[in-house]
From Swiss-Prot:
Assembly mode: Homodimer.
Protein name: 1-deoxy-D-xylulose-5-phosphate synthase
Function, as annotated: Catalyzes the acyloin condensation reaction between C atoms 2 and 3 of pyruvate and glyceraldehyde 3-phosphate to yield 1-deoxy-D-xylulose-5-phosphate (DXP).
Annotated EC: 2.2.1.7
Pfam family for this entry, one: DXP_synthase_N
SUPFAM superfamilies reported for this sequence: Thiamin diphosphate-binding fold (THDP-binding) (SSF52518), TK C-terminal domain-like (SSF52922)
This protein's UniProt keywords: Isoprene biosynthesis, Magnesium, Metal-binding, Thiamine biosynthesis, Thiamine pyrophosphate, Transferase
SMART domains, sorted: Transket_pyr
Alphabetical list of InterPro entries matching this protein: Dxylulose-5-P_synthase (IPR005477), THDP-binding (IPR029061), Transketo_C/PFOR_II (IPR009014), Transketolase-like_Pyr-bd (IPR005475), Transketolase_C (IPR033248), Transketolase_CS (IPR049557)
Length: 640
């Protein structure tokens, strides 16, 4: 495609210089740019395609950054980035090294007001901005999808909107989708609440009937007014009960109508709910037909709108931990006919679709409501029914009190399948699963474990149903290096606190969590080049630790390395040091994990190099710390 307009848009001011008639052409160019770029990099595709005209119209009518846009979640901000000076090579590398973030990021641009990545917070943030703003001429526009209205935080914010708040426009992008199909009563009821077509038609018929009454009935006008009041009481949109003036619904793919509507409401003196109807994936046939699959795509996704190339197909990858977990849950579902599975809007990402299809009555997607997912699971467990709550590590933060108060304090045997435990790499700082141990380890009654491969994952899932206590099984979104057995119950149960020695040596004790065992075994081989032999242990459990085994090993190992893909604060290293202190054991401990910083997005090798968790870095850090020999200077691995 030839780009005649987009290359000349370096800021919203350049957009303002275009005539209204040129905006549809610009929208076509933006849509094609996104498809071309993401076919090489992967990223959030369908939501951005669906929001092209809306974002162009917003930037055309308002003046960012003086007028402030707050994107809920932020993964649908690619168009916003293109219109605010980021149509550069960095966009072509989005979510990769030297590329833009896939979410709004203030470090990139002053047009991005907040870091984003989690759902439901835009309205609260926007209200806070409005409360604290000294600029009375600035407009504040939170931009939310309809799925965000199922978030408790959004409803709490709706309850707090002042009726006299001016220049505050809530933009509702209604595509009737979350990542997958919307669930629950709130998203499904939005159209009925705010666009009551039957009542509108009834109003027209009644008014027509009144106008045809005999002219000597002088109270026709009064009667019409009373009818209006009565019908309005029936059709009053939900959002007007919160003091909002409702405008819409507007065709979200007619950029001219969007501009005209926004210009009309721009300076109204009350808060406004601007309702826009869009099609997720609009402009790409495959994405329109299957917006769930095309919500987030990998590089080289199937795309018939571009010229076919030999690489323009889905690449086959090894089976991942989440895929194994989904398969294991299906097997458990057959073995335990009462087993329930709960997820907060992550059925597809956590590979639960097969369970949902096989056992629809035993599967619940609660929508973007992590706290409810946890407490709902607690209620299921209290009834005596086995339950697994599958949830991303980064989203579990949002339900910390629910885990504490409703699960652990009640001593309920909820199984938490904690997906994406580890670095998220391309999704960046808001999605890394490297903080959950910091609060889970402090929860009484909680058993926490992490498998190094699919076989251990299988053992943990099957065994967890026998523990009768709250438990968390953590696993990353990376290939698992061994296949599961696929037997119904092919092993004796593993008990909480059972560790496993992977290899034995005389000089060092290396304790590695989960998939970092693979790195540890590579490091062990590197250390042999220096004449150093290493005992490598997979603790399997972070809580409780295998105290008996550790005490035995520490009688002849005084040099210990802890290796984990988790924050250095509050993880396995912290638990091990507490264990040493409680047992008055002295040891020289090198704790290696994710440093105390927000980790950016990037390719895996780049991020692991940045934080010093490659096998080469770890080897040199061990040599340097324990002074076994003269190592390669560590500074060479940390270039500025």
């Amino acid at each position: 495609m030839t780009y005649s307009l987009l290359p000349h848009i370096h800021s919203p001011q350049d957009l303002h210089a275009l005539s209204l008639d040129k905006l549809p052409v610009l929208c076509d160019e933006i849509r094609n740019k996104i498809i071309e770029s993401l076919s090489l990099t992967g990223g959030h595709l369908a939501s951005n395609l669906g929001g092209v005209e809306l974002t162009v119209a917003l930037h055309y009518v308002f003046s960012s950054p003086d007028d402030q846009f707050i994107f809920d979640v932020g993964h649908q901000s690619y168009v916003h980035k293109l219109l605010t000076g980021r149509n550069t090579e960095a966009f072509s590398n989005i979510r990769h090294d030297n590329g833009l973030s896939g979410f709004t990021t203030p470090q990139e641009s002053n047009h991005d007001i907040f870091f984003s990545g989690h759902a439901g917070n835009a309205l609260s943030l926007a209200l806070g901005l409005a409360k604290g703003s000294s600029n009375s001429s600035s407009h504040i526009l939170p931009i939310l999808g309809d799925a965000a209205f199922s978030c408790g935080l959004t409803l709490e914010a709706l309850n707090n909107i002042p009726a006299d708040l001016s220049k505050f426009i809530i933009v509702l992008n209604d595509n009737q989708m979350s990542i997958s199909e919307n669930v629950g009563n709130i998203p499904q009821g939005i159209s009925q609440w705010i666009y009551p077509q039957k009542i509108s038609k009834l109003s027209q018929k009644i008014h027509s009937w009144i106008q045809n009454l005999p002219s000597f009935l002088h109270k026709k006008k009064t009667l019409s007014h009373k009818v209006d009041i009565a019908l309005k009481s029936l059709s009053h949109p939900l959002f007007e009960q919160f003091g909002l003036h409702y405008v819409g619904p507007i065709d979200g793919h007619n950029v001219k109508k969007l501009v005209q509507a926004l210009q009309m409401i721009k300076d109204q003196p009350q808060p406004i709910l601007f309702h826009v109807c869009t099609v997720k994936g609009n402009g790409l046939t495959e994405a329109e037909r299957d917006p769930i699959r095309y919500h987030g795509v990998k590089a080289h996704f199937q795309n018939t709108s571009l010229k076919k190339t030999s690489g323009n197909v889905e690449l086959q990858t090894p089976i991942s931990f989440p895929q194994h977990a989904g398969n294991i849950l299906c097997r458990l579902g057959k073995k335990y006919p009462q087993l329930q599975v709960v997820t907060p809007a992550m059925s597809l990402g956590s590979c639960l679709e097969d369970f949902r299809k096989q056992f629809p009555d035993r599967f619940t997607d609660v929508g973007i409501a992590e706290g409810h997912a946890v407490t709902f699971s607690a209620g299921i467990a209290r009834s005596g029914t086995p339950v697994c709550c599958s949830i991303y590590s980064t989203f579990l933060h949002r339900a910390m009190d629910n885990v504490f108060h409703d699960v652990c304090m009640q001593e309920l045997p909820v199984i938490f399948a904690i997906d994406r435990a580890g670095l998220a790499f391309h999704d960046g700082r808001s999605h890394h699963g490297i903080y959950d141990l910091g609060f889970l380890c402090s929860m009484p009654n909680m058993v926490i474990c992490q498998p190094r491969n699919a076989l251990v994952l299988e053992r943990l899932f099957f065994s967890s149903l026998l523990w009768k206590s709250p438990c968390a099984i953590r696993y990353p979104n990376i290939p698992a290096n061994e296949k599961a057995s696929n037997s119904s119950f092919p092993f004796s149960p593993i008990l909480p606190g059972e560790a496993e020695i992977l290899c034995q040596g005389d000089d060092l004790l290396l304790i590695a969590l989960g998939h970092m065992c693979n790195t540890a075994l590579t490091v062990k081989e590197h250390l042999l080049d220096y004449g150093i032999s290493t005992t490598v242990v997979d603790p399997i459990f972070i809580k409780p630790l295998d105290r008996k085994l550790l005490q035995s090993l520490l009688t002849h190992h005084s040099k210990v390395i802890i290796l984990e893909e988790h924050s250095i604060h509050g993880g396995l290293g912290s638990e091990f040091l507490l264990f040493l202190n409680q047992h008055n054991i002295k040891a020289d401990v090198l704790s290696l994990g994710v440093p105390d910083m927000f980790i950016p997005h990037g390719n895996p090798e780049t991020i692991l190099n940045l934080i010093g968790l490659t096998s080469d870095h770890i080897t040199q850090r061990i040599l340097s710390h324990f002074k076994f020999s003269t190592p390669i200077p560590i500074e060479r691995f940390f270039k500025a």
